[in-house]
C-alpha cells in the first residue's frame, strides 16, 4: 500500500510539477537572445539534481560501508554530480547545434571501456552501477523536458536533438568514477614510492674496540 501511494504521489508530482516546469524553463532560457545561457544553467541544474535521487543516496552509503570508508559517500556524490553536470552540458550543446548523439556516445563508451583495463576492478563495478543509478526518475522527469523545451525554443528536432539525455547521463558517471579510481591508484603508488626505506641495522659501528667477532 505504501509503495502504491508513493508511486501515485511521485507520478502526480512528475506530471503536474516537474515535467511542465522543466519544459517551460527550457523554452524560456533557450528563447532569449543569449540562448547559450542554457549551457551553464543546465550544467548547474544537473550538478544538484543528482543529489535529489534517492537511489544515488543509497548507492553512496552502500559504497562507503562496503569499502570501510575508503570511498566516502561525499567523494562518490561529487563524482556523480560532476558526471551528470557534464552530460547535461553536452546535451545542451546537442540541442543548440544539432550534433548527432553518436559523436558523444561512441567516444564516451570507448573511453570508459578502455580505461577499465587500468582502473581497479572495484571502481569499474561501482562506475557501471552508478551510471544506471544516476539516470533515475529525476532525469527523466525534469532534465529530459528541459532539453525538449530548449529544443522547441531554438527550432530544432525534438526526436533527434532533445532525446538522448538519459543515455548521456548514464554514460558520464562511467568516466568520472573510473577517473576517480585512477587518481586514487596513482596517489597510492606515489605515496609508496616516496615512503622512506627502513634504516639498515648497524653492523660493526656500535661494537667496542676489544670485541671478538666470530666469522
Predicted regions mapped to residue ranges:
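Transmembrane alpha-helix boundary signature
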Residues: 10-24, 50-55
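Hydrophobic alpha-helical transmembrane segments in multi-pass integral membrane proteins
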Residues: 12-17, 140-157
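Transmembrane helix-loop boundary segments of multi-pass membrane transporters
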Residues: 13, 31, 90-113, 126-135, ...
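Helix-loop-helix junctions within the multi-pass membrane cores of secondary transporters/permeases
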Residues: 36-116
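Alpha-helical transmembrane segments
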Residues: 61-69, 116-131, 188
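Intrinsically disordered, low-complexity non-transmembrane regions of multi-pass membrane transporters
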Residues: 62-70, 182-215
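Hydrophobic alpha-helical segments of multi-pass membrane transport proteins
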Residues: 105-126, 175-181
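Membrane-helix cytosolic exit motif
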Residues: 163, 167-192
Amino acid at each position: 500500500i505504501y509503495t502504491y501511494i508513493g508511486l501515485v504521489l511521485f507520478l502526480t508530482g512528475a506530471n503536474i510539477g516537474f515535467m511542465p516546469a522543466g519544459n517551460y524553463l527550457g523554452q524560456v532560457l533557450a528563447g532569449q537572445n543569449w540562448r547559450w545561457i542554457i549551457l551553464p544553467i543546465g550544467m548547474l541544474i544537473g550538478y544538484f539534481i543528482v543529489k535529489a535521487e534517492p537511489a544515488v543516496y543509497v548507492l553512496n552509503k552502500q559504497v562507503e560501508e562496503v569499502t570501510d570508508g575508503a570511498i566516502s559517500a561525499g567523494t562518490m556524490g561529487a563524482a556523480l554530480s560532476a558526471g551528470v553536470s557534464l552530460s547535461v552540458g553536452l546535451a545542451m550543446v546537442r540541442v543548440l547545434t544539432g550534433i548527432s548523439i553518436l559523436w558523444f556516445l561512441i567516444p564516451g563508451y570507448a573511453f570508459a571501456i578502455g580505461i577499465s583495463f587500468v582502473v581497479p576492478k572495484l571502481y569499474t563495478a561501482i562506475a557501471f552501477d552508478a551510471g544506471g543509478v544516476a539516470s533515475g526518475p529525476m532525469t527523466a522527469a525534469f532534465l529530459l523536458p528541459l532539453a525538449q523545451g530548449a529544443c522547441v525554443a531554438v527550432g530544432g528536432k525534438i526526436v533527434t536533438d532533445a532525446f538522448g539525455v538519459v543515455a548521456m547521463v548514464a554514460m558520464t558517471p562511467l568516466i568520472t568514477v573510473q577517473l576517480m579510481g585512477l587518481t586514487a591508484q596513482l596517489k597510492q603508488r606515489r605515496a609508496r614510492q616516496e615512503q622512506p626505506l627502513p634504516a639498515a641495522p648497524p653492523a660493526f659501528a656500535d661494537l667496542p674496540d676489544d670485541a671478538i667477532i666470530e666469522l
